[in-house]
């Protein structure tokens, strides 16, 4: 009896395997419930390669796709780094390519979809990106483009899906695609999303991101799911060529006296509790330990309130709003994106200056209207929390102001990338407003060690700053 492979709910079933054959096949375990051997679907390529190399006969009932032809409607003339990335990826037909926002990751994927010639499932984090990808794919392929997400369930040889929808369907669609493309692939190692990769047999995998690093260090797991980091280009390498030239200005803002007093009081309450409870945020579970300890006593709950207050005061001080107004006045005629850490701050700024606000709560028709008005110049300023961090194309933006954000380097590189799409004569500038002598200041210092921030200028905490040097 020959060995047979079957796909079953995101795994592989192996029937008829001999004991001596199993010693050659890693990650294969006996399943008492089904009385057969089972392996993760992600191991399909490795298992099939081993079986062929060892000349072990087998029947493949798992794979439900075959080679396909996707001719391009128009010629692509890749930039040199895109061609290098494509050539490098094609050697293994697996791997992660890290390119800055605006450097043409989508066009690279189009090239590789055509070269690979396999039914392709493209994963994206948002519905906006799903629609954006479909528009580009329709420009280059005659083949119908399917969508999976936002209430649409239309599977085609080339399909774009949100990570959430792909996760739902992988148990029964995981054997129908030969190439998986993961846009913003740094999401992939997440506790849930990783199963979109684990549950698919696709032998060919392309990860796309601007910054593969994760705060939790799980980029190693990303490479296990998608292939190693095979090509990388940094923002500073493309500045002034493929991307617009840019500068980053960190502006230290001095809190108002009443804000400073509240901050110091709250900070003292919070840090005293940390010392007393011996909470160490350098520990991998430091944050979880802090949350647990703050829930165990009235003192802990007060410390948690103090933590939230000191954080809010440093991120959303009135002095920052004053400085933002100065920047808005200085950059009249430019297209500005204002970034905040949370929706509350974004809406506060929107109300203060009568500006349109984009968040995850903004309905799609309103979002599209805001983005169109931004492109035409009717709305020269957009305020957003995190919804523009990834993917949404705003090529006309040339000024970014980060009022507040997380400690994530990726988030700040993504926000920088929002304003770097090249235009003739374009000079981009990103301002970071940082409350001086606070935890936010030291977070900013760590972030500036990233190479994208080399050459950053730190402007001292003074009001009435002259910004003419940034023109």
Task: Write out the residue ranges for each language-model feature.
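Accessory DNA-engaging acidic/polar modules
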Residues: 1-84
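Walker A/P-loop
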Residues: 91-116
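Conserved SF2 helicase motif VI
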Residues: 99, 211-212, 408-428
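Conserved helicase ATPase core of P-loop NTP-dependent helicases/translocases
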Residues: 131, 135, 144-155, 335-339, ...
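A short beta-strand element within the Helicase C-terminal
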Residues: 175-178, 220, 383, 390-406, ...
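Post-DEXD/H (motif II) to motif III coupling segment of the RecA-like Helicase ATP-binding lobe
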Residues: 186-247, 258-261, 265, 272
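Conserved helicase/translocase motor-coupling segment
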Residues: 282-363, 367
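Conserved segment of the helicase C-terminal RecA-like domain
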Residues: 418-446
């Amino acid at each position: 009896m020959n060995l047979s492979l079957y796909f079953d709910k995101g795994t592989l079933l192996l029937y008829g395997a001999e004991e001596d054959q199993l010693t050659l096949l890693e990650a294969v375990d006996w399943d008492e419930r089904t009385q057969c051997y089972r392996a993760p679907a992600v191991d399909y390529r490795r298992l099939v390669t081993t079986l062929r190399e060892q000349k072990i006969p087998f029947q493949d009932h798992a794979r439900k796709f075959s080679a396909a032809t996707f001719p391009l409607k128009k010629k692509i003339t890749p930039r040199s780094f895109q061609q290098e990335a494509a050539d490098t990826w094609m050697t293994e037909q697996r791997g992660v390519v890290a390119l800055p926002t605006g450097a043409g990751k989508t066009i690279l994927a189009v090239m590789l979809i055509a070269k690979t010639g396999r039914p392709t499932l493209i994963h994206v984090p948002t519905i906006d990106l799903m629609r954006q990808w479909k528009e580009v794919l329709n420009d280059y392929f005659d083949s119908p483009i399917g969508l999976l997400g936002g209430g649409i369930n239309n599977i085609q040889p080339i399909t774009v899906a949100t990570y959430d929808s792909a996760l739902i369907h992988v148990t029964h669609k995981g054997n129908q695609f030969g190439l998986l493309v993961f846009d913003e692939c740094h999401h992939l190692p997440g506790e849930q999303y990783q199963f979109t990769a684990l549950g698919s047999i696709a032998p060919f995998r392309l990860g796309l991101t601007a910054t593969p690093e994760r705060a939790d260090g799980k980029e190693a797991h990303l490479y296990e799911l998608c292939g190693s980091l095979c090509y990388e280009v940094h923002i500073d390498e493309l500045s002034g060529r493929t991307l617009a030239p840019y500068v980053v200005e960190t502006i230290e803002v001095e809190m108002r006296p009443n804000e400073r007093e509240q901050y110091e009081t709250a900070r003292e309450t919070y840090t005293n509790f940390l010392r007393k409870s011996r909470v160490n945020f350098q520990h991998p579970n430091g944050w979880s330990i802090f949350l647990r300890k703050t829930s165990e006593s009235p003192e802990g709950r007060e410390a948690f309130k103090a933590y939230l207050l000191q954080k809010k005061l440093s991120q959303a001080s009135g002095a920052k709003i004053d400085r933002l107004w100065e920047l808005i006045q200085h950059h009249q005629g430019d297209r500005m994106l204002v970034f905040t850490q949370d929706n509350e701050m974004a809406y506060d700024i929107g109300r203060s200056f009568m500006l349109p606000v984009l968040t995850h709560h903004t309905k799609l028709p309103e979002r599209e209207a805001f983005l169109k008005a931004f492109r035409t110049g009717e709305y020269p300023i957009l305020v957003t929390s995190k919804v523009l961090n990834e993917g949404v194309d705003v090529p006309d933006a040339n000024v970014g102001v980060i009022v507040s954000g997380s400690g994530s380097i990726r988030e700040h590189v993504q926000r920088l990338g929002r304003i770097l799409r090249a235009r003739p004569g374009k000079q981009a500038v990103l301002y970071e407003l940082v409350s001086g002598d606070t935890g936010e200041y030291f977070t900013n210092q760590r972030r500036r060690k990233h190479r994208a921030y080399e050459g950053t200028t730190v402007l001292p905490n003074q009001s009435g700053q002259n910004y003419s040097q940034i023109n």
